[in-house]
Amino acid sequence: MQTPRPLDAEELAYVADVARLAEAARAALPQAATPCHAHLRVRAEGRTRDYLLGPQTVTGDEVTILRWDQAPLAGAFFASVEGGDYELRAGDRTLSGAVLARSLLTLARGELVALTRNGVRYARDANGAWSASPDLDVAPLRPRPDARRRPPSAVEVTLDAEQQRAVDLPAGAALLVLGEAGVGKTTVALRRLAALRERHGDGPWSAAVIVPTEGLRRLTEALLERLGVEGVEVATYDRWAAKLARRAFHDIPVRESEDAPPGAIRLKRHRALAEVLPAFAALPPADPKRRVGRRDLHHLFGDRAWMDKVVARTDEVTAHDAARVHDHTRVQYMETTEDSFGAGVDRGRLATADGRSIDAGTRYGDAKTVDVEDYAVLFEIDRLRAKARGERPAMPRRYDVVVLDESQELAPLELRLLGRAVAPGGTLVVAGDAGQQVDATACFTDWETSMRDLGAARHTRVTLATSYRCHPDVTALARHVLDPASPAPALGPDGPVGFLACEGECHLAARLTDGLRELAVDDPRASVAVIARTSESARRFAAVLGRGVDVRLALDGDFQFGPGVQATSVREVKGLEFDHVVVPDASSAAYPEGGEGRRALYVAVTRASHRAVFATTGRWTALLGDAAPRASDQRASSV
């Protein structure tokens, strides 16, 4: 580490100017814990102006503060570098000029104590003297070596012996493929499907691949295309089940609910509900003309007595959850506002400006809807009643091959329905990893139970052990996150894992945009995923990082499989991989202690094929354990 040096005259003058502005900011925003985060000096229209970036916009005689994340001109700080030009849109105006200086500020008790500018950190000691040293708090994003810039796709790799044995099992043998992230579970599952298709030869043949997320569905379609396998139905479970249910049960509402409470979803997906259904199915149908229909769902979920029976069977579903189901069901069986006006009212006069229903966004927004979770419930009630009557139940479409990927996210009734989709003599392929089970409502127990639910108690289990995606240090860190007893790797500054600790969101956005901008120059074909804990956080990071670099918000599976930066959430990235992964909220608030947080962080970090970067504006999540930088080492660890 270099010895700090004294400041030259120009540096002293700049620090003095910024200190004066910071003092004025403290006077302008006396209640703000941090009245300013950064300094921006621009030249526009022949004049030089100084601005501070802070928590809100303030215009005064002594200082102008721009809200850092919203003010149009503040975008020049993120979109340009010192000495560069900027051009920004502000409504119907264009703001243009040149950035003369930009720096990140550190305040203590309202006074400027440090700033970073152009790779140099200026700090004031206890005696008020300033010194300069290299800025070490840079975003640790590094380009891939040339050898890793054109890796083969997941289906183009040569299988190892263990993977090949799984692919070569005879048709009709149910296969369970397990293993941690990056070991090739999806590769094996799809290669087995391709091998079965080739062995089948000419003649009718059908297959389906069912996945939990839209992003994985789109990736699977692309991988099958590369394998040259045609005619495979690739769907998310929700869309697959919806299509089947609408064919089988004709009184299902057109709309699906958007605001079902988490507790209601948890109860409807729990095994305890499946255990109660035989008694409910023994009752006469609510509609004598149908073996089962929507009115049966009303009698089941709208009756607190039945919901109390579910609660009595498990500690994982609460009376509060049952109450949420009851309240949600009551709304679902109400008329919509549009319907309440009757047929005599012109529907065009009821149209809203945004095209949504009148009830949307209100407590009655789910009126006249069905829950996605109801589809499997309907099929199970129908199956039970058909069996009691000696009749044929409503059947899902049957396939010669059914592949379930990330199957740990499927609930018991969903698995039962999917198991019925395998044709007699057909082949079931199941891939999953309990360590990546992030949907708290899925009710995953263990793999033997899941395979019984699928009707495949007899199956071949293959556990893959070699990770092909992640660097060994990333794999070791992921194991440590999932299981604290697993040793943390010794992470060096030149390794595949980086840490970036910032004192606020503005600093974090600036550090990451600078790092992403440099990476785009050094490794323009790299794919980067900024994986936030939630969708709301992903939208926030897409907005603030998008002020400086091109960032694509990828939610609801809307991924671009190629170079560029995408902001998304943990739930979206199952089964996907990127060259670089940034976890921008690796704090104890986003990832608290507990199994759910551990699995979520594990999923995020194991998406990285080259480098994983953790960033935070608060305390590091305890889930990083011994791998997290110590407070005393934080500056040195952020390189």
Question: Over which residues does each language-model region extend?
Answer:
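P-loop NTPase Walker
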Residues: R102, A108-L115, V120, R124-V254, ...
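Generic alpha-helical structural element
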Residues: L7, R144, R148, V209, ...
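Alpha-helical nucleic-acid-binding subdomain
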Residues: A194-L404, Q408-R420, G426, G435
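A structural signal for short, well-ordered beta-strand segments and their strand-loop junctions
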Residues: H39-R41, A114, L176, V430, ...
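Conserved helicase motor core of SF1/SF2 NTP-dependent helicases
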Residues: W205, E214-R218, A222, R226-A242, ...
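Phosphate/oxyanion-binding active-site loops and adjacent basic polyanion-contact surfaces
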Residues: P151, V155, K185-A189, V370-V377, ...
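Extended, charged low-complexity regulatory segments
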Residues: M1-E156, D160, Q164-R165, P393, ...
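Short, hydrophobic/proline-enriched secondary-structure or compact coil segments at domain edges
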Residues: C36-V42, Y375-D382, I531
